[in-house]
Regions:
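Asp-based, Mg2+/Mn2+-dependent phosphohydrolase catalytic module
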Residues: 1-4, 93-96, 109-216
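N-terminal helical cap/lid subdomain that shapes the substrate entry/recognition surface
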Residues: 1-98, 111-114, 122
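Ser/Thr-glycine-rich phosphate-binding loops at phosphate-binding pockets of nucleotides
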Residues: 13, 17, 106, 167
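A generic structural signal for short
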Residues: 13-14, 79-80, 101-102, 132-133, ...
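Conserved SAM-binding loop
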Residues: 14, 41, 84, 102-105, ...
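N-terminal start-of-chain detector that recognizes signal peptides
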Residues: 23-25, 74-76, 100-103, 131-133, ...
Length: 216
C-alpha cells in the first residue's frame, strides 16, 4: 500500500485509555440509572457529546452541556493507567525521522485528548484534530477530511489507522486508505480496509525518494 501521510486515531489506537474511559462512563451510567454495559457498547469511537445526546434524549441542552462539562473534567484529570500502546511511540518517531507527515484525529475533546497524549508520552503531532474542530463526529467523514486537508494532502493520499468501528467507517467514508488495528471482528465494512492488524508493531513504513510511503 502507498500513501503520503498518516491519520491516527488516539484512544485504542495510539494509547490504551480503555480502563479510564470505561471507568468514567460506567460511573456516569450508574449515576443515571443506566446499565454500564449498554453505555459502553455505544460510546467507543464517538464524541462524548454524541453519546450524551443519545442517552439523555429529551433532556434540555443545558442539562446535556452540564453533564458534558462534568464528564470532560473527569476524563481529562483521571488519567491513571493510560499508556502508549505497543509500537506507537516507535512508529511515530520513525515517521518524524523520515519526514512523513502525520496527524492525530480523535473524537475526544481537546482537554481530554491533550491529557491522554501527554500522559502516554507520545511525540507531538503536526496536526491535532479534536471534537471541537468538526460539526459531525465519527462515523461521518468530517474529522478525517479535515486532518488530510491540514496536512496538505488529498484524502486518498492518507492512511487512517483506527481501532473503533465508528472510526473505520469514518476513514472509509472520507476516501482514505484504512488500517484497522485491534478492531472488533464484527466491525461494519471491515472487509474493505487495506490491512487488518493486531498491533502497530506489525506496520513497516518506508519512504521513497519521490515522497511516496510504502506500508507493509
Amino acid at each position: 500500500m502507498r500513501c503520503k501521510g498518516f491519520l491516527f486515531d488516539l484512544d485504542g489506537t495510539l494509547v490504551d485509555s480503555l480502563p479510564a474511559v470505561e471507568r468514567a462512563w460506567s460511573n456516569w451510567a450508574r449515576r443515571h440509572g443506566l446499565a454500564p454495559e449498554e453505555v459502553l457498547a455505544f460510546i467507543h469511537g464517538k464524541q462524548a457529546i454524541t453519546s450524551l445526546r443519545h442517552f439523555m434524549a429529551g433532556k434540555s441542552k443545558a442539562d446535556i452541556a452540564a453533564e458534558f462539562t462534568r464528564l470532560e473534567h473527569i476524563e481529562a484529570t483521571e488519567t491513571e493507567g493510560i499508556t502508549a500502546l505497543p509500537g506507537a511511540i516507535a512508529l511515530l518517531n520513525h515517521l518524524n525521522k523520515a519526514g512523513i507527515p502525520w496527524a492525530i484525529v480523535t473524537s475526544g475533546s481537546m482537554p481530554v485528548a491533550r491529557a491522554r497524549h501527554k500522559i502516554a508520552g507520545l511525540p507531538a503531532p503536526e496536526v491535532f484534530v479534536t471534537a471541537e474542530r468538526v460539526k459531525r463526529g465519527k462515523p461521518e467523514p468530517d474529522a478525517y477530511l479535515l486532518g488530510a486537508q491540514l496536512l496538505g494532502l488529498a484524502p486518498q493520499e492518507c492512511v487512517v489507522v483506527e481501532d473503533a468501528p465508528a472510526g473505520v467507517l469514518s476513514g472509509l467514508a472520507a476516501g482514505c486508505h484504512v488500517i484497522a488495528v485491534n478492531a472488533p471482528a464484527d466491525t461494519p465494512r471491515l472487509n474493505e480496509v487495506d490491512l487488518v492488524l493486531h498491533s502497530l508493531e506489525q506496520i513497516t513504513v518506508t519512504k521513497q525518494p519521490n515522497g511516496d510511503v510504502i506500508i507493509q
